[in-house]
Amino acid sequence: MSTYHPKSGDITRKWYVIDATDVVLGRLATHAADLLRGKGKPLYAPNVDCGDHVIVINADKVAVTSNKREREMRYRHSGYPGGLKSMTLGRSLDLHPERTIEDSIVGMMPHNKLTAASAKKLHVFSGSEHPYAAQKPEAYEIKKVAQ
């Protein structure tokens, strides 16, 4: 019996919506990255894009533990000499929470060409409204852990 390899036509993609209200940023990122890669599916293969679409709402209400809002730094570079820009995680979450959560989720995925295709299925919104109601997304609950 030969090993089964899924093809792109064999995969049925679901839509999930995650409410980020009071969810720790790292826990949210790992759950969303696993959904985007399709790690929970029986047809999972690391070389095939078999993940689902993920919608993250209330990105501006995500939780960050300890004093990481002031301690953690976010960096980006313009490509020009002296073009390194930095800001704290708290300032980044205040200015553009969607981009900060997208960067965190994509950072939890392997850095290859397949991740670029999987990241296109990630949709992050700072409010509770999203334009994907016609796809009938399922609510995905992230369990709270007592700390």
Swiss-Prot record:
User: Quick check: keyword Acetylation in the entry?
Assistant: no
The protein's GO terms of the molecular function aspect are: mRNA binding; structural constituent of ribosome
Which terms are listed as keywords in the entry? Answer: Ribonucleoprotein, Ribosomal protein
A Gene Ontology term for the protein's cellular component: cytosolic large ribosomal subunit
Question: Which Gene3D superfamilies does the entry mention?
Answer: Ribosomal protein L13
InterPro entries under this entry?
Answer: Ribosomal_uL13 (IPR005822), Ribosomal_uL13_bac-type (IPR005823), Ribosomal_uL13_sf (IPR036899)
Query: Biological process GO terms, please?
Result: negative regulation of translation; translation
Per the record, the similarity remark reads: Belongs to the universal ribosomal protein uL13 family.
Functional summary from the UniProt entry: This protein is one of the early assembly proteins of the 50S ribosomal subunit, although it is not seen to bind rRNA by itself. It is important during the early stages of 50S assembly.
Task: Describe, as the record does, how this protein assembles with itself and its partners.
Answer: Part of the 50S ribosomal subunit.
What protein name applies here?
Answer: Large ribosomal subunit protein uL13
Naturally occurring in which organism (per UniProt): Corynebacterium glutamicum (strain ATCC 13032 / DSM 20300 / JCM 1318 / BCRC 11384 / CCUG 27702 / LMG 3730 / NBRC 12168 / NCIMB 10025 / NRRL B-2784 / 534)
Q: What is the lineage of its organism?
A: Bacteria, Bacillati, Actinomycetota, Actinomycetes, Mycobacteriales
